[in-house]
């Protein structure tokens, strides 16, 4: 299931995924795993995490020094930057501890046409 999404939403309706980036299938993103994709429009890296069956998509960029977050340890709902140990909440993007103080962007995730999709929805 997608975090924060009504599980009955969109049933029986063909959902438009234009402007969305294909991530993969549930079988390719099991609980405890993550995957990085590049937004089809902005080319920004997005990290998608499966935490106990819920999907979260965030900017794959530490706001402390610009390093990749993907590959850092996950503690509950927090990802730890592998470079300097800053932590970010995957549910909100909030910076949880120094050396980062600015949040990371959080992106929508949806399931449609048998796959997982995300997009950089920043203006």
Where are the regions that the model predicts?
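Short cysteine clusters
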Residues: 62, 81-84
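Short helix-to-coil "ATP-lid" hinge immediately C-terminal to the conserved N-box Asn in the Bergerat
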Residues: 87
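Short cysteine/histidine-rich metal-coordination sites, predominantly Zn2+-binding motifs
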Residues: 76-82, 95-104
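N-terminal pre-ligand scaffold of iron-sulfur
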Residues: 9-76, 90, 103-123
